Amino acid sequence: METEFGLTEYASEHTITPVPCLLKEMYSDFIVQEILADHTVLAIPSPDVVLESTGSKKEDIEIEECVAKPDCISEETLAALNDRFSTKGDPVLVKVDDLSKEDRKSIHHFIRERYAGVLITETKEDGILVSHGHTKSSRKRKLWDEKVPKECHFTICKENKETSFACQLIAKFLNVGPNNIRTHGIKDKRAVTSQRVSVTKVHERTILDLNSKLRGIRVFGCEYKDDPVQMGAHWGNRFSIVLRSLPDDSEQLLHQRLETFQNTGFINYFGTQRFGSRSSTTAEIGLAIVKRDWEKAVKMIMTNAMPDHLGYGSVGYAAKCFSQTGDARKAFSKLKGAQAFATVEGNILKCLSKGGTWQNCITEAIPIQSRSLYVHAYQSLIWNKVASRRVKEYGTRVHESDVGANGFSLGEHATHYDIHIPLPGENLPFEGSYGAKWISELLEEDGLTQSSFTALKDRFSLGESSRCLFVEAKELKWKFIRYGNARDLLQDGLQTRAIPEAEQKGPLLALQIQFSLISGSYATVALREVTGSDMGKKAMRDASFKTRGDDEKTEENVLEEKGSDDANELNLVSEDQ
């Protein structure tokens, strides 16, 4: 599978023979902790720590006593408003009989300023209704204390969930649009991950209260800031990974390879998970989008959903209905729960059922962080092929024709880590480089040019212009672990604990490897340099079933294969971004 996506070379100058192993056998075998721009590594706390923060930390919001009270508000009404601020209860009705427009306006202003937006006013026929929080009729009007920064940043910790699904689910519960939830990037699904997220004008208490509603997701660590989280603005990710079922005689060989890996790094390929494992790859869908063949792109997305578990209410069931009938409204009605609003297919069916065009489905119905993945996948495929050609023709050392991140020739003190290759698209600094030339040749085979991407930049977040050819795995650590049972937990998870060190013994051998990568680099590609094996999802799943036999599939693998209401997979690739 790797070779069809351009992953053909290695950074090591020695021939690498494959070492069989199992990756992501248990969710906690693959832990991803986002590293912020200031190099803070986001923690994955114990369930107790998360639950203690749930709804227990109150907003640091107090009554603004200095706000002048209008003469039209009585002391009795003021006392009722103060009481309502302190405790939730029935709304307070402020009578406005015979009051002027300016007086009524002053009441709204007074309540908003004195109670920092916690109390909400609504104009009714018999007066002004004041309630604690948003009522159904006022929930779209979000009053906010201007002295409080409008962006609430918080950490999401999730297990076996797509980032896109988790964000859309949180958006639904918070009653905000999915594009209002911002992240630095998308994290792996079959893993335990932590990442920073932001949402506009939502109180900390409201966010923490979600912990009672979410399964396999925890939110915590709220902080108000002026600006939202920006895509790609973090430093990278910290990985803690377990490779299981290693051959008994592989320990010395892997130790030697890890020492080499520490010095040479690895080729910065885009991993196979970027391209998916369905009948139509995400790169093929991306190619259709770049060609503006919107109908083909939509139909490929929907066809990809059909191999899933076809139980009633599932995405696969609805996709099959749409394929057979062409009736988007009928197909959309087959979805249940979060499948209707937190999946790409659900968004598409909803758009079509309301009269949207094929283009609307791609450019509007699918959230930007999700739709961008398709075009990025096509760019990634082209980049991988060019990177392989570069290593095959010039080796791993700096060559005179190499260029750096600015498109200029490299100096005499440059290392292989300084080599950059452009991504497809108009890129003036790299014009004339071998990278730009080879990319144009590959695009021409698909009927495209570099300018084909220009009009897509804004709608598909095509910001990155180049990518380093080699990457160093920083703060590398490793240790070998013995264990006795194939399902022994060897790392702490979101709600599980690893077996004690005293019990880490037995006939089975595993490698725990930890390292930090810059944003956009793939841990599975780094592991490939060590194991010499295809570390992609399909290859690892096949290896897992072969090792234990179809009758011994773990519960996690069975759920992964069938699909589950709790997982609600988006059928998109995940990126170690």
Swiss-Prot record:
Active-site residues, Swiss-Prot/TrEMBL: D188 (nucleophile)
InterPro entries: PsdUridine_synth_cat_dom_sf (IPR020103), PsdUridine_synth_TruD (IPR001656), PsdUridine_synth_TruD_CS (IPR020119), PsdUridine_synth_TruD_insert (IPR011760), TruD_catalytic (IPR042214)
GO BP annotations listed: pseudouridine synthesis; tRNA processing
Cellular component annotations (GO), alphabetically ordered: nucleus
Keywords: Isomerase, tRNA processing
Basic and acidic residues: bias regions: 538-565
Group of enzyme by EC: isomerase
EC number: 5.4.99.-
GO MF annotation, one: tRNA pseudouridine synthase activity
Region (Disordered): 538-577
All residue ranges annotated as the TRUD domain in the record: 265-472
Keyword Isomerase: yes
Catalytic activity: a uridine in tRNA = a pseudouridine in tRNA
Keyword match Nucleus: no
Family: Belongs to the pseudouridine synthase TruD family.
Name under which the protein is recorded: Putative pseudouridine synthase B0024.11
Species this protein is from: Caenorhabditis elegans
